[in-house]
């Protein structure tokens, strides 16, 4: 008998709990979804581009056409090679290939202002109004590159110079 009374009391107590409004339930659901998504999102892939050597330029058949970007002294080796049909950067000793984005703007020497790679996207801002004549037919263009991971998070930004020709 005592058990029946306890069960009846528990049943009555559970009936007296207020139901959540639709707005409260939606807010709780959105919060739970955001918590799950935050737990599944990996941290950004922090990268530091390395200089591309003359041997790598030869191995990947990168011509002198297009632009070679470097933070300082592009003559010593570029951190990005940007051409009409391809772009390359080097991370952790491995070359990453980029394809020009067909919908992007045009840069100097037939380059693009956006390139897409397997792991990263590259946004290139050429300051062509500040371009200066360099050796031969080359032009020195102040440039900013922004590297993004696959989730469009910025993982690297640098100001430097592009030698274009």
Could you say what each language-model-derived stretch is?
Residues 1-13:
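Sec-dependent bacterial lipoprotein signal peptides
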Residues 15-18:
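Bacterial signal peptide processing site
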Residues 20-104:
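An ectodomain-focused feature that recognizes extracytoplasmic/extracellular
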Residues 84, 139-143, 157:
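Short, surface-exposed coil-to-beta transition loops
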Residues 96-98, 121-122, 155:
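Short, isolated positions in well-ordered beta-strands
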Residues 108-151:
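Acidic, glycine-rich flexible loop segments
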Residues 154-165:
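Short, low-complexity, Pro/Ser/Thr/Gly-rich segments in the mature regions of secreted, periplasmic
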């Amino acid at each position: 008998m005592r058990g029946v009374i306890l069960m009846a009391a528990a049943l009555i107590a559970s009936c007296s709990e207020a139901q959540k409004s639709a707005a409260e339930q939606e807010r709780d659901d959105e919060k739970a979804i955001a918590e799950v998504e935050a737990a599944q999102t990996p941290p950004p892939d922090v990268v530091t581009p390395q200089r591309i050597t003359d041997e790598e330029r030869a191995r990947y058949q990168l011509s002198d056409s297009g632009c070679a970007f470097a933070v300082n002294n592009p003559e010593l080796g570029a951190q990005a090679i940007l051409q009409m049909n391809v772009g390359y950067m080097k991370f952790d000793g491995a070359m990453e290939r980029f394809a020009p984005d067909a919908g992007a703007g045009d840069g100097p020497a037939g380059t693009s202002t956006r390139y897409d790679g397997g792991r990263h996207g590259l946004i290139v801002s050429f300051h062509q109004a500040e371009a200066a004549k360099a050796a031969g037919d080359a032009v020195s263009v102040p440039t900013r590159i922004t590297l993004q991971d696959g989730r469009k998070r910025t993982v690297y930004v640098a100001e430097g110079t592009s030698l274009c020709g």
